[in-house]
Amino acid sequence: RYPFLLVDKIIDLSESHVVGVKNITFNEGFFQGHFPGNPVFPGVLQIEAMAQTGGILALSTVADPGNWDTYFLKIEEAKFKSKVVPGDTLLIKMELLAPIRRGICQMQGTIYVGNKIVSEAGLTAQIVKRS
């Protein structure tokens, strides 16, 4: 949700994977301080973009996704291979590693700029129905 939405659109969604797109623009507020005169899209926000994209995959498995929340439980093996700058378009791929059981889902995330991997991580989340 705005103002913390880090996925512009979903371009592919199946039972086992999802692909989202995020266009990085200089207008993003965090570029004022990260870093002045040398804008770099923060790695922690790349992980958040993976989490948001993965949340769409996880919630696509329930009948009424608007009544569920996704909570991320674990981030593993996060790697940042190249910096992301204004003008880049991120292709965010999330793959389900095993069937969702008891609301727990394990995913592998990879972010590309063009054909180049810029970051990757394993994420574990839980989907919970709102009471």
Where are the language model's segments positioned?
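Short, electropositive, low-hydrophobicity segments enriched in small/polar residues
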Residues: I24, G37, F41, I47, ...
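Catalytic strand-loop segment that frames the active site of acyl-thioester-processing enzymes
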Residues: Y2-F41, Q46
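Conserved positions in beta-strands of structured domains
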Residues: D8-I11, E76, K81, E95-L97, ...
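Short coil/loop residues immediately preceding or within conserved phosphate-binding loops
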Residues: L5, I75, Q106
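HotDog/MaoC-like acyl-thioester-processing domains
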Residues: V84-K93, L97-S131
